[in-house]
Amino acid sequence: MSEFRQATDAFASNPVESKQEIRNYTMNFGPQHPAAHGVLRLILEMDGETVVRADPHIGLLHRGTEKLAESKPFNQSVPYMDRLDYVSMMCNEHAYVRAIESLMGIQAPERAQYIRTMFDEITRIKNHLMWVGSNALDLGAMAVMLYAFREREELMDVYEAVSGARMHAAYYRPGGVYRDLPDRMPQYKESRWHKGGALKKRNAGREGTMLDFLEEFTNTFPARVDEYETLLTDNRIWKQRTVDVGIISPDLARAWGMTGPMLRGSGIEWDLRKKQPYAKYDAVDFDIPVGTNGDCYDRYLVRVAEMRESNRIIKQCVKWLKANPGPVMVTNFKVAPPSREGMKDDMEALIHHFKLFSEGYCVPAGETYSAVEAPKGEFGCYLMSDGANKPFRVHLRAPGFAHLSSMDAVVRGYLLADVVAMIGTYDLVFGEVDR
């Protein structure tokens, strides 16, 4: 008899040892884990490699954004919105400025509405490019991140050209947008890395206006999405890691208040851009991609299809904006600042400018809820005014908070390695979760 068999028989014959049970153990996942997507801390109860329970701990990025917004004039809180979901900046701004416009009873000019629609979709593509690259990286497909950031860099240049900032744009304003689209795109300058033919190639398409640049981008982007799909969609390893992993049924998705790709991946066709149109979404043509199985693979397919639909919307907006010049800010000077030229010649205009940006404006008493279809789901802003120049109450509805609440119900029964895939498809950003 082998030594192993003898040891096993001795263990089984010991009445004390045989009564002992194998107990589950606890594992801390994050907040320093590279796949935690920020500061997610999961306390996992494990039975071997199988997850028995998952407790998400949040609050490590709490900055008191709602209370900060309540301490500032209405027009000074727009930059705070950029720093919530810091991958979907202008969509956050859109919800906030729409809430102010609703209380004040004003509407942005038509050209500003088209610009907002276009930049919402540029933001959606930027978000999904970041997501597809980082999610693939989490699961071991490293090349996709390099491909995705190639196009994302071009859209970052568009952000910078229109607002001066690559991320925190603060471009939307109550009553319109900060300024009209620029007549030129920034170009790369000669350096030790870029010169000669390579420099000329990088600056191709940047000689004209921003709309010319975006028109060229929309013509080439579908082929770039095909490249991402070549790397992932039929990849055997990718499908093994995502198919039938993290299945969320339609009933479960509704029960947890899911929105965006998380909800549409489960087969529910709900999109605020179609169901409750805002800006100019009722004037553009696009489809709502939905999944069938509700697993990680379906959520991936939904986001890839959304990039194609966003590209369609941008193309339509560019066509309209080229043909229809006009104002991008309301003429209500209670909300809109005077021109820079006017301030230099007119003392009243200078006083008006100073008062507007130091004290702001009083918003009529009332309350409203404004929501937009952000890349991650429904991002909403509940705004209450008591008639002063500062909000009485600001509450922000972050899609990631509702999605993270379902983590325990979704990951139970899956392996530890599958948790990384599921967290990736949640597309969490803790700036908005913790607020």
From Swiss-Prot:
What keywords were assigned to this record? Answer: Cell inner membrane, Cell membrane, Membrane, NAD, Quinone, Translocase, Transport, Ubiquinone
SUPFAM superfamilies registered for this protein in UniProt: HydB/Nqo4-like
Q: Which domain of life is it from?
A: Bacteria
Q: Which Gene3D superfamilies match?
A: Cytochrome-c3 Hydrogenase, chain B
Catalytic reactions on record: a quinone + NADH + 5 H(+)(in) = a quinol + NAD(+) + 4 H(+)(out)
Q: What is its main location?
A: membrane
Supply the name of the protein: NADH-quinone oxidoreductase subunit D
Annotated organism of origin: Xanthomonas axonopodis pv. citri (strain 306)
From the UniProt record, report the name of the gene that encodes this protein: nuoD
